[in-house]
Amino acid sequence: PPPNPEGTRQARKNRRRRWRRRQQQIRSISERILSTCLGRPAEPVHLQLPPLERLNLDCSKGTATGVGSTQIPGESCAVLGSGTKE
């Protein structure tokens, strides 16, 4: 979590600096793990997504249709609603 905003100005500045340094270390370690162990770059590969118009939910079948599965197993389509305001 981000640093606590309490304390003197100098204390907050030090906490932010330490927090940023810690986050940089985490990023550095994760990049190293991804590149050496998994053999892939740390940068995410751009994923081509289909247009939203092609995605739909078909509640009559009990499963989602379209590209990929968008329904949570065990969840009813009625929970999602029609998307229109009443």
Swiss-Prot record:
Record keyword Cell membrane present: no
One term under GO cellular component: host cell cytoplasm
InterPro entries in the record: REV_protein (IPR000625)
Main location as per UniProt: host cell
Biased composition (Basic residues): 10-24
Sorted UniProt keywords: AIDS, Host cytoplasm, Host nucleus, Host-virus interaction, Methylation, mRNA transport, Phosphoprotein, RNA-binding, Transport
Residue positions, PTM Phosphoserine: 69
Region (Disordered) location: 1-25
Gene3D superfamilies reported for this sequence: 6.10.140.630
UniProt motif Nuclear export signal and binding to XPO1: location: 47-58
Gene Ontology biological process terms, A to Z: mRNA transport
Post-translational modification: Phosphorylated by protein kinase CK2. Presence of, and maybe binding to the N-terminus of the regulatory beta subunit of CK2 is necessary for CK2-mediated Rev's phosphorylation. Asymmetrically arginine dimethylated at one site by host PRMT6. Methylation impairs the RNA-binding activity and export of viral RNA from the nucleus to the cytoplasm.
Ranges spanned by the short sequence motif Nuclear localization signal and RNA-binding (RRE), renumbered to the chain: 8-24
Protein's UniProt keywords contain RNA-binding: yes
Subcellular location: Host nucleus, Host nucleolus; Host cytoplasm
Gene Ontology MF, one: DNA-binding transcription factor activity
Function according to Swiss-Prot or TrEMBL: Escorts unspliced or incompletely spliced viral pre-mRNAs (late transcripts) out of the nucleus of infected cells. These pre-mRNAs carry a recognition sequence called Rev responsive element (RRE) located in the env gene, that is not present in fully spliced viral mRNAs (early transcripts). This function is essential since most viral proteins are translated from unspliced or partially spliced pre-mRNAs which cannot exit the nucleus by the pathway used by fully processed cellular mRNAs. Rev itself is translated from a fully spliced mRNA that readily exits the nucleus.
Domain notes: The RNA-binding motif binds to the RRE, a 240 bp stem-and-loop structure present in incompletely spliced viral pre-mRNAs. This region also contains the NLS which mediates nuclear localization via KPNB1 binding and, when the N-terminal sequence is present, nucleolar targeting. These overlapping functions prevent Rev bound to RRE from undesirable return to the nucleus. When Rev binds the RRE, the NLS becomes masked while the NES remains accessible. The leucine-rich NES mediates binding to human XPO1.
Remarks, miscellaneous: HIV-1 lineages are divided in three main groups, M (for Major), O (for Outlier), and N (for New, or Non-M, Non-O). The vast majority of strains found worldwide belong to the group M. Group O seems to be endemic to and largely confined to Cameroon and neighboring countries in West Central Africa, where these viruses represent a small minority of HIV-1 strains. The group N is represented by a limited number of isolates from Cameroonian persons. The group M is further subdivided in 9 clades or subtypes (A to D, F to H, J and K).
Subunit structure: Homomultimer; when bound to the RRE. Multimeric assembly is essential for activity and may involve XPO1. Binds to human KPNB1, XPO1, TNPO1, RANBP5 and IPO7.
Name of the protein described by the UniProt record: Protein Rev
Organism from which the protein derives: Human immunodeficiency virus type 1 group M subtype U (isolate Z3)
Gene assigned in the entry: rev
